[in-house]
UniProtKB/Swiss-Prot annotation:
Annotated localization: Cell inner membrane
Record InterPro entries: CcmE (IPR004329), CcmE-like_sf (IPR036127), NA-bd_OB-fold (IPR012340)
Lineage: Bacteria, Pseudomonadati, Pseudomonadota, Gammaproteobacteria, Lysobacterales
Pfam families in alphabetical order: CcmE
Transmembrane spans: 9-29
Origin species: Xanthomonas axonopodis pv. citri (strain 306)
Chain positions recorded as heme binding sites: 123, 127
Family designation: Belongs to the CcmE/CycJ family.
Chain's gene name: ccmE1
Listed name of the protein: Cytochrome c-type biogenesis protein CcmE 1
Amino acid sequence: MNATRKQRLWLVIGVLAAAALAVTLIVFALQRNMSYLFTPSQVRAGEAAGYQQFRLGGMVKAGSIQRAGDSLKVSFIVIDKNAATQVEYTGILPDLFRDNQSVIANGRMQGGRFVANEVLAKHDETYMPKELKDAMAQGHLGKPVPATVAPLTAPR
């Protein structure tokens, strides 16, 4: 093997090693930032037990919203057809947050309750994220969830 071929071989090996290192770092970064969505039924079944941080999706139970008088702390219950999970959140809730509305809370389980660091409310009366609709449909024993299609309109 002459010197030019040897130099090219080391260059190719170096480029491949750098690419492998970059891919490995990207995969680890994406895994740390992934947030899985679970319904209250899945949480109760223990499917979320291995996740430190995850999203909880469902409906806000009517009459369950309790606000602390001296702080921004709010407590409410997220339900699906088969289970309920107590949620605590400290912060300003979205304007569309209310009873019987679809909600997604990002946070972690702590002492049997879900402590949220972010709460998202659905943005209109017909929208439900596909992953939440699919997850809730699995919890509806024998009852299909109706399609939720909202017409797209261009901003004016």
